[in-house]
Regions:
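Conserved anion-binding
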Residues: 56, 64, 68-151
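Hydrophobic faces of well-ordered beta-strands that scaffold small-molecule active sites
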Residues: 2-9, 33-35, 59-63, 85-88, ...
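Glycine-rich phosphate-binding active-site loops on the catalytic face of alpha/beta enzymes
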Residues: 81-95, 138-150, 175-176, 181, ...
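Alpha-helix N-cap and loop-to-helix initiation/capping positions
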Residues: 13, 17, 40, 70, ...
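Conserved N-terminal beta1-alpha1 strand-loop-helix module at the mouth
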Residues: 1-59, 66-69, 75-82, 132-138, ...
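Alpha-helix boundary/capping residues
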Residues: 25, 189, 221-224
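Catalytic cores of alpha/beta
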Residues: 68-80, 122-129, 157, 161-195
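Alpha-helix-loop-beta-strand connector modules within alpha/beta enzyme cores
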Residues: 42-65, 93-118, 152-181, 211-224
């Protein structure tokens, strides 16, 4: 089984009126829901977080800001909102300091991450070594791996190498758009994966209905 995180996001931005979207899928059987630090106000994100917590879900915020200052502001906002997980970011030591005293599980990006939407660069061995170094830090729980955002790497080989190197769970995020990709990530040992854009575009079985697609993905992930 692999964990599915439904992201209330499209093109690396939180969708408009995310709380309204969440209310439409709250009965699908999800365990995890997430959003990005770009595209919605802190108040909107807090509303989603509070509703999801009331429904028994864990909440993830993924940081995709491209500047260090914006990244750290987003991590601070995540702590203020009260999310359970903070994903992404490229300055783990600074992120650890910002999250000091928070209960959020911190999972930064391994490797070299550039641009928005985010792209992962580097050789597999380099990314795996980055994974080892980052998860050795006190205050890092796991990793947010942009497995399908690497322009050339074999996704299965990349994910397997990072999973082996990591001292914590690996969540594969970005551009997951098919059940075949989910199976690849599961076989490679990823703890979980995120899907947002592909569902909002109706590209999964059950589409275009968002709730039907979520149920299909949950079944493929072994959570139905």
């Amino acid at each position: 089984m692999i964990e599915f995180v439904f992201m209330l996001t499209h093109h690396d931005r939180t969708v408009d009126r995310p709380a309204d979207v969440y209310r439409g899928i709250r009965d699908c059987g999800l365990r995890y829901v997430g959003f990005k630090d770009i595209g919605a106000s802190v108040a909107d994100l807090r509303e989603v977080c509070d509703q999801a917590h009331a429904d028994g879900l864990e909440v993830m915020l993924e940081v995709v800001s491209t500047s260090k200052a914006d990244e750290l502001r987003s991590i601070a906002a995540a702590a203020e909102i009260g999310v359970d997980w903070v994903l992404g970011g490229t300055h783990p030591r600074d992120g650890i300091a910002v999250l000091a005293g928070s209960k959020a599980r911190y999972c930064p990006f391994p490797g070299t991450v550039v641009d928005h939407p985010s792209v992962l660069l580097g050789e597999i061995a380099e990314i795996a070594e980055s994974a080892r170094e980052i998860t050795a830090l006190d205050g890092v729980y796991g990793l947010d791996l942009l497995a399908y955002r690497h322009p050339t790497a074999d996704v299965a080989a990349l994910t397997s190498a990072v999973v082996r190197a990591s001292a914590g769970p690996v969540i594969a995020a970005g551009s997951v758009a098919s059940l075949e990709q989910v199976a690849t990530l599961d076989a490679a040992g990823a703890w979980g994966f995120t899907i947002g854009s592909a569902i909002f575009e109706g590209r999964l079985p059950g589409g275009p209905a968002i709730d039907a697609q979520i149920r299909q993905v949950l079944a493929a992930a072994g959570q139905a």
